[in-house]
Amino acid sequence: MEGMAQHPVPRTVEEVFSDYKGRRAGLIKALTTDVEKFYQLVDPEKENLCLYGFPNETWEVNLPVEEVPPELPEPALGINFARDGMQEKDWLSLVAVHSDSWLLAVAFYFGARFGFGKNDRKRLFQMINDLPTVFELATGTAKQSKDQLTAHNNGSNSKYKSSGKSRQSESQTKGVKMSAPVKEEVDSGEEEEEDDDEQGATCGACGDNYGTDEFWICCDMCEKWFHGKCVKITPAKAEHIKQYKCPGCSIKKPRIG
């Protein structure tokens, strides 16, 4: 495949992990921020289609490679045929599961090809396992709920960054969904616990962890949290949004037929 030939072959554990992260980021984009475009490309009327992720964090829907056996393990074949026969959420979850399987297959293909020993394989798996899966991010089951991102940037004057003193109820926070999440019920003695929770918070688009110097926004529909840059929302733009819908929720509307 043309996209695969453009990237150097990883040979060390770190290089294989970097390759894995790049491909994973591309697949996450396809199933979250670019989901509308992805949905349209996966046409059931076309031949067997696959979803590919590349090391440069891009993705592509294409036919499988013609060479047999292929140079790399191939992703699930014919994902387009089930698109209209399932609920959209279930179909995307299925694609995400197969995407995770493919990512592992590619990573350990490189490991086998370049003779990784037991310790290298174990280290590679641990590095991979420390990241949320594509499935977890695409379905919102990764740790990123309002209960996990709490008061950040204490002392900040921004209305979109809640401080340790601004403990608000759910009804009060609805109007400032762009701020870091606030717990509904928080005791003063839980602040240390909150710091631990926020370490595991991840963006629903790119899968990266929360950074205190970054702007985040929460979807009012699915309650996933996203980097503003990942969903192309700035603090200024967010100020005029009454109810924010992420790209995935924006296309979830009744389909005829």
UniProtKB/Swiss-Prot annotation:
Q: Where is this region: Disordered?
A: 145-200
Show the InterPro entries listed in the entry. Answer: Alfin (IPR045104), Alfin_N (IPR021998), PHD_AL_plant (IPR044104), Zinc_finger_PHD-type_CS (IPR019786), Znf_FYVE_PHD (IPR011011), Znf_PHD (IPR001965), Znf_PHD-finger (IPR019787), Znf_RING/FYVE/PHD (IPR013083)
Example GO biological process term?
response to salt stress
Please tell me whether the keyword DNA-binding is annotated for this protein: yes
Which tissues is this chain's protein expressed in? Predominantly expressed in the roots.
Query: Per its record, what triggers expression of this gene product?
Result: By NaCl.
One Pfam family this sequence matches: PHD
Q: Which SUPFAM superfamilies match?
A: FYVE/PHD zinc finger
| Zinc-finger ranges (PHD-type) | 200-252
Q: What is its main location?
A: nucleus
What Gene3D superfamilies is this protein classified in? Zinc/RING finger domain, C3HC4 (zinc finger)
Q: Where does the record place Acidic residues bias?
A: 187-199
Where in the cell does this protein reside? Nucleus
GO terms, molecular function: DNA binding; histone binding; transcription cis-regulatory region binding; transcription coregulator activity; zinc ion binding
Mind telling me which residues the site (Histone H3K4me3 binding) is annotated on? Y210, W216, D220, W225
Please list the residue ranges that the record marks as compositionally biased, kind Low complexity. 153-166
Q: Which UniProt keywords apply?
A: Chromatin regulator, DNA-binding, Metal-binding, Nucleus, Transcription, Transcription regulation, Zinc, Zinc-finger
Entry comment, domain topic:
The PHD-type zinc finger mediates the binding to H3K4me3.
Q: What is the annotated role of this protein in its UniProt record?
A: Histone-binding component that specifically recognizes H3 tails trimethylated on 'Lys-4' (H3K4me3), which mark transcription start sites of virtually all active genes. Transcriptional regulator that binds specifically to DNA sequences 5'-GNGGTG-3' or 5'-GTGGNG-3', including promoter elements of the salt-inducible PRP2 gene. Plays a role in salinity tolerance.
Q: Which family does it belong to?
A: Belongs to the Alfin family.
Q: How does it assemble?
A: Interacts with H3K4me3 and to a lesser extent with H3K4me2.
Protein's UniProt name: PHD finger protein Alfin1
Q: Provide the taxonomic classification.
A: Eukaryota, Viridiplantae, Streptophyta, Embryophyta, Tracheophyta
Gene expressing this chain: ALFIN-1
